[in-house]
């Protein structure tokens, strides 16, 4: 609905905008900041609110004052809740698993989106400094690796080896979740690039912390080789030719989920190093997604049942979100040059919230 097309696939733009506004209004109105007892300020709600808020932001000129107010309440409440929550870690400094079998990288990285969205939308808010410090802390923590604890490096003025209380990613950039090296969770590195792009869209310099270990984690999908044995046959990289996904330690959410990776590929095509071949993988996964969709006449992607994708809370919706993110990310590949903020933020808390 943000394009200039007046008619697409038989649906007029005005109708799409009207439906989008209804969704934005309905979701934001039911947030706890607007409706006592409503949803929000809990697990994954930072991701839900950012998805809604970005849609509102893209259509801001079409929202009335009341709609803008409830969106603002939602965004600011989620950013403040995230700042209070602070970073969490999979392992402590000694390597002991604090949350056995489950990295916190997904939760920490999607939490990052809330303060980033708030910064982008409300540049004069009294909580702006706290949102920025919170976002920097979450970005550093999200995909921190064991080797970071011994390296001499400073990110936004923060001595990582000295200050980091734990780690979330494996040394090779992969992520452990559900007790296995899990590509479905490694792809959450897109949240760092998504947050960075939100700031770019607001013409705000992006803290260097937003890119911390991101390229390394993407290589866990596109470059890292898994030998078989000990990993499952046939071995190789997670990203296989023709858009297929190899799961080195088994399946969590389904055997055919190419759309899950289109979003991260879209951002990687903008931000990762050329040798990751992100553009080629983006095209392969998008083609495979389209091939799945062409099996049906109703626009859906997945077959009924749980074999291809078992996510019961909206597998089609999640696929569409990833495709939309890839499209949006692509618009920034040759967009305005990004400004990176290398300033020091010595009061960032890596061990607790605000």
Language model feature labels by segment:
Residues 1, 121, 129-142, 177, ...:
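Terminal, non-catalytic domain-edge segments
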Residues 13-33, 78, 230, 234-245, ...:
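Long, compositionally biased, intrinsically disordered segments
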Residues 1-214, 223-228, 240, 244-259:
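Aromatic-lined, polymer-binding surfaces characteristic
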Residues 218:
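Histidine-centered metal-binding segments
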């Amino acid at each position: 609905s943000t394009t200039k097309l007046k008619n697409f696939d038989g649906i007029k733009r005005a109708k799409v905008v009207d439906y989008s506004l209804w969704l934005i209004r309905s979701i934001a109105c039911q947030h706890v900041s607007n409706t006592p007892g409503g949803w929000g300020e809990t697990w994954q709600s930072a991701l839900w609110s950012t998805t809604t808020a970005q849609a509102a932001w893209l259509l801001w000129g079409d929202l009335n004052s009341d709609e803008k107010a409830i969106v603002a309440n939602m965004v600011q409440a989620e950013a403040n809740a995230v700042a209070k929550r602070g970073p969490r870690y999979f392992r402590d400094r000694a390597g002991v698993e604090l949350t056995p079998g489950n990295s916190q990288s997904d939760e920490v990285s999607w939490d990052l989106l809330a303060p980033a969205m708030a910064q982008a939308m409300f540049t004069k808010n009294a909580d702006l400094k706290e949102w920025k410090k919170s976002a920097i802390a979450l970005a550093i923590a999200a995909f921190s690796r064991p080797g970071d604890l011994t390296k001499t490096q400073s990110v936004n003025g923060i001595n990582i080896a000295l200050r980091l209380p734990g780690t979330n990613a494996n040394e090779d950039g992969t992520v452990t979740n559900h007790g296995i090296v899990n590509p479905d969770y490694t792809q959450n590195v897109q949240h760092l690039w998504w947050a960075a792009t939100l700031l770019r869209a607001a013409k705000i310099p992006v803290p260097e912390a937003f890119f911390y270990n991101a390229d390394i984690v993407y290589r866990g999908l596109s470059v890292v080789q898994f030998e078989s044995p000990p990993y499952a046959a046939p071995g190789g990289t997670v990203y296989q030719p023709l858009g297929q996904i190899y799961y080195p330690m088994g399946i969590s959410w389904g055997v055919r989920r190419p759309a899950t990776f289109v979003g991260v590929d879209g951002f990687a095509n903008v931000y990762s190093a050329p040798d990751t071949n992100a553009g080629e993988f983006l095209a392969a996964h998008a083609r495979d997604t389209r091939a799945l969709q062409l099996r049906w006449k109703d626009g859906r992607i997945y077959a009924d049942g749980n074999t291809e994708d078992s996510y019961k809370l909206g597998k089609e919706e999640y696929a569409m979100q990833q495709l939309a993110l890839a499209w949006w990310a692509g618009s920034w590949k040759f967009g305005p040059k990004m400004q990176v903020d290398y300033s020091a933020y010595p009061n960032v808390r890596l061990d607790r919230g605000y």
